[in-house]
């Protein structure tokens, strides 16, 4: 097995805090250093800067977990791939808490650009994931976008949306 450590809410950290955190993690026996855009507020440029900072201190595998509050999860995942991040999280239809994650099907399209290999995946999405998405209401919306802009945790949005006053 492999052990990964995930730095959560990385956009909220200064570069000094990121450096200090990586230095602490280096003292462990972790195999992979992950970072998460927990609020879905990163853009490609900041993603690239964070990756370069981590890689300047960490020689083992790296990973990224993106959220799609502002519709940038795919863009940030591609940026991570272009900057040699080894592990890229994605989920079918972006399934995940709140606004969701990088969509597997979009990532495959961007990486392969071979639509004929996606028929089975698209059937899976249509028949199974879209009904689940409708039932459990994941995916981005203006509330999650606003939350991403203002560093508001997705839990607050979920609680607000489930409250009959809103």
Model-derived regions, located:
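Catalytic cores and adjacent flexible loops of soluble metabolic enzymes
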Residues: 1-166
């Amino acid at each position: 097995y492999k052990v990964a450590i995930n730095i959560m809410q990385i956009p909220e950290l200064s570069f000094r805090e990121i450096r200090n955190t990586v230095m602490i993690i280096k003292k462990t026996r972790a195999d992979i250093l992950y970072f998460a855009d927990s609020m879905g507020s990163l853009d490609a440029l900041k993603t690239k800067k964070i990756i370069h900072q981590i890689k300047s201190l960490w020689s083992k595998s790296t990973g990224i977990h993106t959220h799609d509050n502002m519709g940038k999860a795919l863009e940030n995942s591609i940026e991570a791939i272009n900057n040699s991040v080894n592990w890229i999280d994605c989920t079918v239809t972006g399934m995940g808490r709140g606004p969701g994650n990088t969509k597997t099907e979009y990532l495959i399209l961007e990486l392969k650009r071979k639509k004929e290999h996606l028929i089975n995946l698209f059937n899976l999405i249509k028949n199974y994931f879209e009904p689940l998405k409708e039932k459990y209401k994941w995916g981005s919306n203006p509330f999650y976008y606003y939350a991403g802009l203002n560093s508001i945790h997705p839990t607050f949005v979920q609680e607000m949306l489930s409250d009959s006053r809103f």
